[in-house]
């Protein structure tokens, strides 16, 4: 059953962060449009914050997928989710925004679990730790 736990941890990590990988890549492809969308919410210095969001999403998701510095990657996603959720998804009179808020809260929970437990056996973290000692 250890193999099942390891396999499920790997698949769970990938599925948890695919949305962030896709979103980060999408933001690169539509940088100006995304910056304009952010400005509609009263944000200033949108290019700076957008660049940060892209870095957090891409580095965090790749870290989690590879299982390399997994807890750090999960932390990057957690830090990204807090302002994103509070700035863009708190209009609860809009059902879609309420769903987006709850989706982000759920992903926050998944990242907290990953931060607490680590990546598991099918990860670079595990293999490097095992190799060292």
Predicted regions and their residues:
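Membrane-interface interhelical connector segments
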Residues: 29-44
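Extended, low-polarity transmembrane helix blocks
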Residues: 1-29, 47-55, 59, 65-133
């Amino acid at each position: 059953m250890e193999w099942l736990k390891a396999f499920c941890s790997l698949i769970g990590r990938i599925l948890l962060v695919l949305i962030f990988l896709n979103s980060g890549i999408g933001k690169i492809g539509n940088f100006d449009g995304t910056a304009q969308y952010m400005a509609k919410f009263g944000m200033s210095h949108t290019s700076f914050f957008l660049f940060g969001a892209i870095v957090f999403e891409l580095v965090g998701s790749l870290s989690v997928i590879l299982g390399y510095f997994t807890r750090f990657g999960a932390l990057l996603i957690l830090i990204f989710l807090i302002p994103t959720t509070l700035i863009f998804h708190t209009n609860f009179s809009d059902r879609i925004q309420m769903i987006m808020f709850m989706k982000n809260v759920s992903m926050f929970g998944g990242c907290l679990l990953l931060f607490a437990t680590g990546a598991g056996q099918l990860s670079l973290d595990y293999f490097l730790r095992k190799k060292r000692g």
